[in-house]
Amino acid sequence: MADLAKIVEDLSALTVLEAAELSKLLEEKWGVSASAAVAVAAAPAAGGAAAEEKTEFDVILTGDGGKKINVIKEIRAITGLGLTDAKALVEGAPKPVKEGVAKDEAEKLKKQLEAAGATVELK
């Protein structure tokens, strides 16, 4: 067991470049590929994640719908941005207005922006 503890300590002291080199050397020595093992291990996790319901959303402004002034006013009210920043956000669409918000809040923000004339999508 002392030998294993020493190996763990030695591996923990490696830099990222040294660890990558070690990985390549082990692949050559054992005749395996680390990337294949990672792909196989990640596949079941990806399937499980797709089944889960998304809980955080990004509110993305995709356009001003020809009502730029109303949309800028609404962006300022929602985000607290100054006039210049809000105008830049609207003119630079598609841009995120808020990121990582709950589903209810995202839906509420989408309705507010659409009422002002904006086109919005949730991601």
From Swiss-Prot:
<dbReference type="Pfam" id="PF00542">
    <property type="entry name" value="Ribosomal_L12"/>
</dbReference>
<dbReference type="InterPro" id="IPR013823">
    <property type="entry name" value="Ribosomal_bL12_C"/>
</dbReference>
<dbReference type="InterPro" id="IPR014719">
    <property type="entry name" value="Ribosomal_bL12_C/ClpS-like"/>
</dbReference>
<dbReference type="InterPro" id="IPR000206">
    <property type="entry name" value="Ribosomal_bL12"/>
</dbReference>
<dbReference type="GO" id="GO:0022625">
    <property type="term" value="C:cytosolic large ribosomal subunit"/>
</dbReference>
<dbReference type="GO" id="GO:0003735">
    <property type="term" value="F:structural constituent of ribosome"/>
</dbReference>
<keyword id="KW-0687">Ribonucleoprotein</keyword>
<dbReference type="Pfam" id="PF16320">
    <property type="entry name" value="Ribosomal_L12_N"/>
</dbReference>
<dbReference type="InterPro" id="IPR036235">
    <property type="entry name" value="Ribosomal_bL12_oligo_N_sf"/>
</dbReference>
<keyword id="KW-0689">Ribosomal protein</keyword>
<dbReference type="GO" id="GO:0003729">
    <property type="term" value="F:mRNA binding"/>
</dbReference>
<dbReference type="InterPro" id="IPR008932">
    <property type="entry name" value="Ribosomal_bL12_oligo"/>
</dbReference>
<dbReference type="GO" id="GO:0006412">
    <property type="term" value="P:translation"/>
</dbReference>
<comment type="similarity">
    <text>Belongs to the bacterial ribosomal protein bL12 family.</text>
</comment>
<comment type="subunit">
    <text>Homodimer. Part of the ribosomal stalk of the 50S ribosomal subunit. Forms a multimeric L10(L12)X complex, where L10 forms an elongated spine to which 2 to 4 L12 dimers bind in a sequential fashion. Binds GTP-bound translation factors.</text>
</comment>
<comment type="function">
    <text>Forms part of the ribosomal stalk which helps the ribosome interact with GTP-bound translation factors. Is thus essential for accurate translation.</text>
</comment>
<protein>
    <recommendedName>
        <fullName>Large ribosomal subunit protein bL12</fullName>
    </recommendedName>
</protein>
